[in-house]
Regions:
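A short helix->beta-strand "capping" segment at the edge of beta-propeller domains
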Residues: 34-57
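Blade-level signature of beta-propeller repeat domains, shared across WD40, Kelch, NHL, RCC1
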Residues: 333, 337-406, 413-425
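Repeated scaffold domains used in trafficking and secretory/extracellular systems
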Residues: 53-65, 99-112, 148-161, 207-225, ...
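Surface-exposed loop and turn segments in beta-propeller and other repeat-based domains
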Residues: 46-49, 94-98, 138-150, 192-213, ...
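Secretory targeting signatures
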Residues: 1-40, 389-426
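Structural motif
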Residues: 77-84, 122-128, 175-189, 236-255, ...
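Short loop/turn segments immediately following beta-strands, especially the blade-tip
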Residues: 87-88, 127-136, 183-195, 256-263, ...
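Entry beta-strands of beta-propeller and related beta-repeat scaffolds
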Residues: 65-71, 113-117, 163-170, 224-231, ...
Length: 426
């Protein structure tokens, strides 16, 4: 190919124009072809081949593309189980044995890959990842929190690790209101079921936040040492005399301070939106938090400052590069990807065909789980390593274009150089 181009370029000028015109046509055709492959690659719709295949997934926490803890609907009720890397399954809560996971409101994957859930008033259950257990089994530790300041249910939990110590912030149902409580500090021995009790021997449970603002807290996430993100909502009557059955609901995003003492967490700053709800608080590895809402989103910086965006969604997932992917409702043909404050709309080959009920990220893949209008179980997976790779159509065309462009430019430079040198020594 190089010798052919060189031959054209060494001919009279009209052949050079033919060569340049051909190259221009190649550029235009390449641009059209690249635009034609602009749909996001690595996307698959359909049923899943995981252990939850055919069952409705209500909540799921991934530790890799093949390992997760899932809350699913079965023929006897709602179960909670863990699937390991090897594909083995351990039932944590089995509805066929008179227990049920229906009251479980959250699952949080800790930094050590253990998963913590609430199992009753003042009670947490830590599901130890097999790699944290000497014999490689899935073991469970039950943590009974101090009830000297009252009984409470736990609706969400976030973790903050600083050096060798860890602290937790929890959303708690105090009976008459929703509150926030801290628990810590916890030593590094909490990883193993053999030493988790001793690691919490000196841990302190704080009192509950005085909720004079009337916020219904729902989610928490770690920001930096001493700072946390929290979200929830406020309700109020739209006009005097309006029905209490149809109040106005507005979303709330707040920055919370807690010093790992018995003192209650306090609200540092609070933002109230115009409408919708915050469905996800996405904790990022750079000590920032992305609050994704149905009518807008908020980025909470490490120092607690907030930046607000207009993009709404029904599900949000962060990948291993701290890119937050926002997904819309049924029929949505795009996803918006946020990274370092920049939004990038990405086209899907076809619209979402189901309502998302659970989502997560493994090692390289994003997973959305839900049911379609016919009640069929559906899963959407996105391989985040596919865009721009040589395996994707767009990546291949980009590679081919760069290759041909490089060959042409090298040949043209080579020929021009030879002519210049020849003219110099004549």
């Amino acid at each position: 190919m190089a010798s052919g181009w060189r031959g054209y370029l060494e001919e009279e000028s009209e052949y050079q124009w033919i060569a340049m015109t051909g190259f221009l046509i190649f550029i235009l055709l390449g641009a059209v072809a690249i635009q034609g492959t602009s749909n996001l690659p690595g996307v698959e719709f359909g049923s899943s081949d995981a252990s939850h295949a055919g069952t409705r997934v209500l909540d799921i926490e991934y530790t890799s593309d093949t390992a997760f803890t899932a809350k699913v609907v079965t023929g006897t009720g709602i179960d909670l189980y863990m699937q390991t890397e090897s594909g083995s399954v351990t039932r944590i809560i089995d509805s066929s044995s008179s227990s049920d996971a229906g009251e479980m409101q959250f699952m949080t994957t800790l930094d050590n890959d253990n998963v913590v859930v609430a199992s009753g008033e003042n009670t947490l259950m830590v599901i130890h990842d097999p790699k944290n257990v000497a014999n490689g089994e899935v073991l469970i530790s039950t943590i009974q929190l101090d009830n000297s300041t009252g009984d409470f249910e736990i609706a969400d939990l976030a973790e903050r690790t600083s050096g060798s110590s860890t602290s937790w912030l929890m959303v708690t149902n105090e009976g008459s209101s929703m509150g926030l409580r801290g628990f810590g500090s916890i030593s590094e021995g909490a990883t193993s079921p053999d030493t988790i009790a001793s690691s919490m021997a000196t841990s302190i449970l704080s009192t509950a936040t005085d909720n004079t603002a009337g916020v219904v807290w729902e989610h928490v996430a770690s920001l930096s040492d001493g700072l946390w993100g929290a979200s929830g909502y406020l309700t109020y009557a739209t006009t005097a005399g309006s029905s209490p059955a149809t109040p106005t609901i507005v979303p709330v995003v707040a920055v919370i301070e807690w010093d790992t003492s018995i003192n209650a967490p306090t609200i540092k700053t609070m933002y109230t939106g115009d409408g919708g709800t915050i469905h996800s608080l996405v904790q990022l590895s750079d000590s920032t938090v992305f609050a994704a809402g149905t009518q807008g989103s908020t980025y909470i910086h490490e120092d607690g400052e907030m930046t607000h965006f207009d993009d709404g969604s029904v599900a949000a997932v962060a990948d291993n590069q701290d890119r937050v992917w926002l997904f819309g409702d049924v029929g949505s043909k795009t996803t918006v990807r946020y990274h370092q404050g920049q939004a990038e709309p990405l086209s899907l080959a076809r619209g979402l065909t189901f309502e998302t009920e659970a989502s997560g990220f493994g090692t390289h893949q994003i997973f959305l789980h839900g049911t379609d209008e016919q009640g069929a179980i559906q899963t959407l997976t996105i391989d985040t390593s596919a865009p721009g790779s040589i395996e994707s159509g767009r990546g291949f065309l980009n590679f081919m274009f760069l290759g041909v462009f490089t060959i042409v430019m090298v040949v043209m430079a080579w020929t021009a150089g030879e002519r210049l040198l020849g003219a110099k020594f004549r």
